[in-house]
């Protein structure tokens, strides 16, 4: 039994009947054989071969596909040569295709320590021939830009000529940006006399107890990063994601029921911000929004030498300031490293329980240039 699926008319009297599908139950699938072989050739690349045959009832004809190829690297330059053959019972002609591709990274011509914006870009070329006179050539460049590699671009042009194919030129260009507050994309394509422009935006929003946070498109399970005061800090191993102006960020995908490591990049912290810890581990359940909280100390960073009387404050003394009760421990020669200090204030120093084992430091930080990461000063404890 055979027949067609007919598209219903819309009411236009000039519309012709459209046959959108064909079926033939007389030629039902009977059996299939497949073989696939691949082999690494050490530093010389790899080769592969695959073949398949689909047989049908009530006919001796069958669908046949054969392909084999060779991939050969020349350092960081990659090349491939492939051949494919196909024949099916619905077509009288057999299809052949011979294809060659070449990919050259821009870094091939750069030093290993190059900071060029195009160090992650590539040039590509491909040629295919149907062995009937038809040939297609494509060439282009693609890669990533920006320090976080979150701007992907691709430009390609090509032409087709000869054989039974229609001759002409074609091309396209695309830009895809992945940002902390969402993704955007724009593209242009042209083929023959027709052209197309497209663009789009996507993202996600989480409403939580501390407000609203924007991010990239959300998955089923995700992580909300909370680091108040640590704004515009990069999230390690996440493309284009950093904390917003309040110190919040969304990690749109997380592994459920497993430890997820969330790390802030300490190198992207502002000069007056220090984190108690830069790595937090969360274990979300399915569909949950896990929160990774980081405690940021905002203020001056000081390496202070404390004097008590004519001597240094004893080794092991605890120094606290304001509401920070965690304290810092005094090292040798009365030196202590303090973070999150306001421009002026008081420090409480303690190394025992009696009144002679406690003192207070009145300090005032000097005005320093923005590039100064650490103040050093000596203070008297009274």
Curated annotation (Swiss-Prot):
GO terms for biological process: pilus assembly. GO terms for cellular component: cell outer membrane. One of its GO terms (molecular function) is fimbrial usher porin activity. Coiled coil: none annotated. This is Fimbrial usher domain-containing protein YdeT. It comes from Escherichia coli O157:H7. The lineage of its organism: Bacteria, Pseudomonadati, Pseudomonadota, Gammaproteobacteria, Enterobacterales. The gene is ydeT.
């Amino acid at each position: 039994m055979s027949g067609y699926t007919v598209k219903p008319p819309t009411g236009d009297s000039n519309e012709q009947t459209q046959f959108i599908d064909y079926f033939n139950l007389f030629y039902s699938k009977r059996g299939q054989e497949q073989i696939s072989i691949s082999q690494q050739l050490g530093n010389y690349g790899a080769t592969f071969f695959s073949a398949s045959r689909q047989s049908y009832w009530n006919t001796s004809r069958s669908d046949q596909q054969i392909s084999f190829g060779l991939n050969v690297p020349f350092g960081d330059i990659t090349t491939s040569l492939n051949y494919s053959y196909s024949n099916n019972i619905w077509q009288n002609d057999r299809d052949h295709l011979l294809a060659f591709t070449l990919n050259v990274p821009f870094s091939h011509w750069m030093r290993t320590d190059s900071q060029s914006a195009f160090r992650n870009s590539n040039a590509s070329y491909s040629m295919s021939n149907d062995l009937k006179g038809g040939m297609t050539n494509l060439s282009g460049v693609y890669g990533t830009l920006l320090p976080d590699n979150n701007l992907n671009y691709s430009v390609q042009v090509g032409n087709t000529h000869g054989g039974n194919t229609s001759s002409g030129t074609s091309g396209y260009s695309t830009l895809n940006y992945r940002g902390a507050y969402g993704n955007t994309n724009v593209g242009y394509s042209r083929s023959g006399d027709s052209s197309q422009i497209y663009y789009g935006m996507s993202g996600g929003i989480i409403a939580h107890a501390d407000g609203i946070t924007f991010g990239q498109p959300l998955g089923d399970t995700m992580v909300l990063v909370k680091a108040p005061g640590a704004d515009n800090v990069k999230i390690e191993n996440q493309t284009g994601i950093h904390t917003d102006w309040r110190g919040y960020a969304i990690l749109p995908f997380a592994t459920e029921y497993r430890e997820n490591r969330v790390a802030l990049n300490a190198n992207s912290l502002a000069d007056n911000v220090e984190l108690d810890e830069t790595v937090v581990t969360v274990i979300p359940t399915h569909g949950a929004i896990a929160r990774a909280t980081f405690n940021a100390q905002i203020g001056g960073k000081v390496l202070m030498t404390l004097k008590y009387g004519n001597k240094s404050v004893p080794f092991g003394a605890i120094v606290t300031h304001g509401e920070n009760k965690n304290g810092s421990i005094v090292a040798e020669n009365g030196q202590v490293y303090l973070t999150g200090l306001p421009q002026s204030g008081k420090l409480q120093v303690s190394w025992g329980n009696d009144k002679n084992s406690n003192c207070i430091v009145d300090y005032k930080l000097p005005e320093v240039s923005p590039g100064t990461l650490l103040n050093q000063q000596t203070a008297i404890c009274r």
